[in-house]
C-alpha cells in the first residue's frame, strides 16, 4: 500500500450482495475537504428530495435510474455524471439495481 494514493480495483466488489428493498452506502474516501461515498440501490429504491450543503457530483457506475435535479428529470445509466451546486434540491430513484458514486466537496 502506498501512502500517496488509494486504489480500489473493483468498485462493484466494495458493495456486498444487496438485500431486497434496500440502499447500502460505504464511504470509500474521506479527507479534510472531500468525501466519496459508494451507494448500492435495489431496484425501486430511492433517495427522496433533499439538498447538500456542499458541491456534489453523482456518477452512475452500474444500472439505470432517474435523477431529479431542481425541476429537471434526467434518465441516467452507467457513465452518467451530474454536478450540483450546494442547496440544489435533488432525488435519485433506481429503475434497476444501481451503483453510484457521490463526491462531496466545498
Tell me what each language-model feature is.
Residues 71-86:
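Short acidic-glycine-tyrosine-enriched beta hairpin
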Residues 86-106:
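Ligand-binding loop in jelly-roll beta-barrel domains
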Residues 54-66, 70:
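Glycine- and acidic-residue-biased ligand/ion/polar-headgroup-sensing regions
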Residues 32, 61-62, 77-78, 96:
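A cytosolic small-molecule/anion-sensing beta-strand core signal
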Residues 1-33, 68:
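A short, N-terminal "cap"/entry segment at the start of jelly-roll beta-barrel domains
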Residues 22, 32-52:
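Conserved short histidine dyad/triad with adjacent acidic residue
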Amino acid at each position: 500500500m502506498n501512502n500517496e494514493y488509494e486504489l480500489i480495483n473493483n468498485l462493484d466488489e466494495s458493495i456486498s450482495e444487496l438485500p431486497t428493498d434496500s440502499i447500502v452506502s460505504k464511504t470509500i474516501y474521506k479527507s479534510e475537504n472531500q468525501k466519496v461515498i459508494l451507494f448500492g440501490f435495489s431496484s425501486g429504491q430511492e433517495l427522496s428530495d433533499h439538498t447538500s450543503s456542499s458541491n456534489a457530483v453523482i456518477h452512475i457506475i452500474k444500472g439505470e435510474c432517474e435523477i431529479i435535479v431542481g425541476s429537471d428529470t434526467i434518465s441516467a445509466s452507467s457513465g452518467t455524471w451530474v454536478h450540483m451546486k450546494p442547496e440544489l434540491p435533488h432525488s435519485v430513484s433506481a429503475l434497476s439495481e444501481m451503483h453510484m458514486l457521490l463526491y462531496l466537496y466545498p
